[in-house]
Amino acid sequence: CGGSSSSTAPTEVVQLRWFVGLGTGTDVETQVPVQQEVVDAWNAANPNIQVTLEVVPNADAKNTLLTQNAAGNPPDVVGPAGVAGSNGFYGQWLDLAPLISDANYDLSQFPAAAVEAFAVGGQGQLGLPFASFPSFMYFRPSLFEEAGLNLPPTTYGDQYEMPDGMMVDWSWDTIREIGMLLTVDSAGKDATEAGFNPKKIVQYGYAQPWNGAPEWASWFTPGQFLQSDGKTIAAPDGWVDAWQWYNDAAFKDYFMPNADTSALEEWGQGNAFPTGKIAMGQSYTWYTCCLGDVLGEDWNIAPTPSNNGTISNDLNADTFRISAGSKHPKEAFEFMTYLLGEASAKLLVIYGGMPARAADQDAFFATLDEKFPQGVNWDIAKASYANATTPSAEAYIPNYLKARDYIYSDFTPKLTKAALNVSDYVTNTFLPALQAIADEAE
């Protein structure tokens, strides 16, 4: 007898790869096991779409992904990664707009501005909101109290009361003034007093935790180096003045540690705020990862200062992307929306990102309150996110990886290495060098 003519062909199992390493997600103790749980749950519920988790150490991830893409073997889903992590692969991400339309995926669950942040001109909708990292001012209340200063404002738009009772805007000019009052030498003199010794400082009013020149300037005025013609590199309006503010803070007004001081062990080797000897520092929500044990519960957050009456809230945002060369884009989108949806609660906890959905934010901050029980004013973080500015400090530049390395490894350190006429240096050295790097991409 012959076989049955009515046999049904087996359904093909689609194999997907999820590549982790361009951003967070590589910690083998706290992150990889949870990501594997997320994959296992998906695989159990979706026998016809099986996912393999591929975790590559951050230091190797860029080269690994470049090699895979060049060999025609790209992973399907990549992330979490921020703007900087993904810009090194410009033109290699899939436009999600057709998939969003075909799946009738509901974009109204996200703020419109958050969706637009992942829409790249000429490239399409390259991602959807997931983990957000708004920026604001970290501060140590006890140092304000010891100096007899009022604490920073608790709401955007509120003014600050100076020691003489004058009400002033919470601005970068104000940060300079109170930063000097909060900077103290070994004799107890602050940086405004006669006889203050800048070589014997025991407490600084301000320190800039990590980040680099684009972020530093973006907190004064949003902008990007690449101009509208897609070729010309220029410093956005206000950025040179912002960089001069930081240089003066270190070498003229002395309320911020310079590069040499910051590198010392007693000043945190590049992360000074957690030493407990720094009054203020501007950063993002992800910085809660790295506050150490010395501060204890003696820290809180305040609004981003204004500049010329305008507040610029730079936003870091991580999400997932689909490789343009994925052989299974429809299935990859299904898995990606699972990461953005059902699996997001687990993932956001291990990534430290604020949920893009407003409905999920209170639960997220409740978990942070368990870790930091002093009553952090998380309404500041929510307001910073709701009023985030664009373009991102991590905006695209041609030859991005080389350009970024030059900006962060060469230019940024110079801003706090020695007293500098920033305008001259930017005009005569920095911008020509950055333009030459961008031109190499042609």
Could you describe each region identified by the protein language model?
Residues 1-90, 101-108, 147, 151-152, ...:
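Conserved N-terminal structural module of periplasmic/extracytoplasmic solute-binding proteins
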Residues 55-64, 168-174, 258-274:
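Short helix-initiation/N-cap motifs at beta->coil->alpha
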Residues 57, 81-136, 145, 195-199, ...:
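Hinge/lid segment of periplasmic solute-binding proteins
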Residues 97-110, 153-167, 196-204, 223-242, ...:
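Short, solvent-exposed loop/beta-turn-alpha elements that line the ligand-binding surface or hinge
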